[in-house]
Amino acid sequence: MAYLLSFGIVAALFLASISLYRYGNIPRQHILVTLSVLTAWCFSFLIVFTIPLDVTSTLYRQCVEEHRPTPAPNVTNTSSATVGPPPQCQEPWGMVPASVFPNLWRIIYWSSQFLTWLIMPLMQSYLKAGDFTVKGKLKSALIENAIYYGSYLFICGVLLIYIAVKGESLDWQKLKAIASSASNTWGLFLLILLLGYALVEVPRSLWNNAKPGFALQYAYFKAAKLSTEKAEAEEHVDDILESLQGLSRVIPNNHELRPCLETILRKVPIELQERASRNFARTGGSGMGATSSTILPSEKALVRIHKQVIKSLQTLQRTEALWSVQVQTVLHLEDVAKNIHSSDRRFKSEFPRQRTQLERICYSASLQWYWECLLKAPFLKTMCVLTATMSAMVVWSELTFFSRHPVLSIFANVIYVAKESYDFFTIEVFSMVVLCYFFYCTYSTILRIRFLNLYYLAPHHQTNEHSLIFSGMLLCRLTPPMCLNFLGLIHMDTHIIPNRIMETVYTQIMGHMDVIGIISNGFNIYFPMCMLAFCLATWFSLGSRALNALGFQQFLQNETIATELVQEGKDLIAREKRRRQRAEEAMARRRDFNRTDQVLGSDYLSKYRSGGPGGLTSSRTPADGLLRDGDGSFDYAAVASSSALGVPRSLSEEINDRFGVSTQVQVGFRDPDYEAETDGRIVGPPPRGLFDDV
């Protein structure tokens, strides 16, 4: 009967692996980063998939306890047979031995806490450190985390003083409860923010995406903003590299700091180095980022600029990749707008991509037209209605789940009705659906979070290691409070609704939906009110309006700035389309020229290679081969620069050429124009080790 648990473990591992493959670049990132993020994501998904099994197991144990026959006081039972479960209680599908869930939750809890509070923060700080030795990087990572955790220790000290003043005794169990309450408090308040935004934004985004005109206008707006961010990232990189060029001229080759400078220069792409050298020569070292000082810098100065180089190059690479993705999105939406009124009902693309035979059979042009132009909009609107209904149920249950008599929570009433008939299958399915919606709302908001343009999960293998580690930390810290909130909504947290049901194994190990005692008074009032306030603020777009008033452009209809940015996005996309058209025309001309050259020179080349009777002599001169009259199988154009010949490059090649070979990074980026025959390409060798800078 444990096949559901096995299926949940496999599904969690599969989803974590697929997500890591989509967002990360597994062949390029370090193996420790891959394993840590995979473990964090897998445990977070596993908690969501396993909670329904724990709920049904708890309800089954309660059923057995309620229907257990009471033995008569004067009757001695001499039978040695084991008493089976009552006939009213049927084992749920996911029933496992009693020792499985306690051991599973302990493994998940302590592994997640160890990863999210110790290992992953140290790894993140190590990756951002600009030192040039292992000892220096570890020292910087420890100092940064000591400052971070020092604030937590200060808060804990204040709480301990508060408890001591009240005259309460402290032991290990109470300290553990305080730590669990503090963690739950942090997670619950962050959950309020994420759910309050997502419960409104998820249905609204589905409805807006069902309107092709609105989606296209918003895509133009995002393209204009990404273009601005890309230009700012390029300017920031140029300023830092000009300063680096000045240091390169100041530090002599035989100086002890020269190897440190060479370590920084090896991370800078060749193209960017050459451009920085030209800018430095043109401005004479008087640019914004340049320095004209002849004083030798200290090692701390090099560490600081090394850290700036790492951060600026990551930002530039991410903006380049996101710009390419956004261009493909806009081009696709334009194709949809042009094909809506097509008479032959076949989807035609302005820039068609080469598709495999299987794609042409399973997803033909006619089928694509029916989906993109006829069925997709009604499907998205239907999903909008369903998610809006689910959001309304969640908000109502959040507002009323503290009510014991009468029970007003919708989710709690559904569980009670199914429990009365011992319909464990309905309980499992309903719990899974609700948790998956919580999961989608919370995690989709995390995937769109941007902190100072540093942490951002970009698809198509464009997410750096810092952002992957940060997302793993955030998921490990948010998943337990999210599941505790769900157990509170269905009235299965005994600290909220006592003496009603048995306690789940999850709450026994992970703790309860408790908060710090100082703020626990009135928590059942301000927690739902905060959730409702965030939902209303998102519904009326108060956050977007406030950011727009502060100068951060947001997509608001009937706003002059938004209209100007939409028009700017149209112009940028039109320029990009002209560039692609010129590249395609140049490639077609080169293809025709090569074909004509091969036809006209085939006879001459065959005689030239034969060297036999009637042919050319086999003697060679130094001038032979200058006009490509050698072996036709060797294509010089294949090794030439594709940009110089006007050949359109893939997005991966554009980014790799932009960042150069010196970065030792080949971006495995797959855009919608990715061809099937490129599947056999090797992304590149894995990194040399964790300490490449040493």
Swiss-Prot record:
Q: Which family does this protein fall into?
A: Belongs to the LIMR family.
Q: What is this protein called?
A: LMBR1 domain-containing protein 2 homolog
Protein's membrane topology = Multi-pass membrane protein
Chain segments annotated as transmembrane: 4-26, 31-51, 107-127, 145-165, 182-202, 382-402, 427-447, 468-488, 515-535
What InterPro entries is this protein classified in?
A: GPCR-associated_LMBR1, LMBR1-like_membr_prot
Is Glycoprotein among the key words of this record? yes
Q: Say where the protein is mainly found.
A: membrane
Q: Which residues lie on this side of the membrane: Cytoplasmic?
A: 27-30, 128-144, 203-381, 448-467, 536-694
Is the keyword DNA-binding assigned to this protein? no
